[in-house]
């Protein structure tokens, strides 16, 4: 009996199936990473918008109000919706300042949320 060299058709089909499945897995992983990177960029920008609102309030030397103050701004080519409010602390000279930022005005969860403390001068 003569020994055959090469692969049978079944072996070739199995090998192609394995490579196809591996390729699909790589594509799915790449797509997820791209989506995660986009979300990370959005959350970073939202954090910067929140920090900018805190700085703006300090520069204006405004005492934070107890009710939500709302507004919107352009940053990194995107429209951001922000809101902030002052929260009473145990010290009448100090308030907590909560800032929330969203890309979608009606979104329940904020893309970024920061708290800092403001001292009356």
UniProtKB/Swiss-Prot annotation:
Protein function: Component of the type II secretion system required for the energy-dependent secretion of extracellular factors such as proteases and toxins from the periplasm. Part of the pseudopilus tip complex that is critical for the recognition and binding of secretion substrates.
SUPFAM superfamilies: Pili subunits
PANTHER family the record matches: TYPE II SECRETION SYSTEM PROTEIN I-RELATED
Gene3D superfamilies: GSPII I/J protein-like
UniProt keyword Cell membrane, yes or no: yes
Family affiliation: Belongs to the GSP I family.
Subcellular location: Cell inner membrane
Keywords from the named record: Cell inner membrane, Cell membrane, Membrane, Methylation, Protein transport, Transmembrane, Transmembrane helix, Transport
Taxonomic lineage of the native organism: Bacteria, Pseudomonadati, Pseudomonadota, Gammaproteobacteria, Enterobacterales
Top-rank taxon: Bacteria
A Pfam family that the UniProt record links to this protein: T2SSI
Topological relation to the membrane, as annotated: Single-pass membrane protein
Description of how the protein assembles with itself and partners: Type II secretion is composed of four main components: the outer membrane complex, the inner membrane complex, the cytoplasmic secretion ATPase and the periplasm-spanning pseudopilus. Interacts with core component OutG.
GO cellular component: plasma membrane; type II protein secretion system complex
Post-translational modification note: Cleaved by prepilin peptidase. Methylated by prepilin peptidase at the amino group of the N-terminal methionine once the leader sequence is cleaved by prepilin peptidase.
Residue span(s) of the pro-peptide: 1-6
Keyword Hydrolase: no
Membrane-spanning intervals of the chain: 7-27
GO biological process, one term: protein secretion by the type II secretion system
Protein name: Type II secretion system protein I
Modified residues annotated as N-methylmethionine in this record: 7
NCBIfam families named among the record's database cross-references: gspI (TIGR01707), IV_pilin_GFxxxE (TIGR02532)
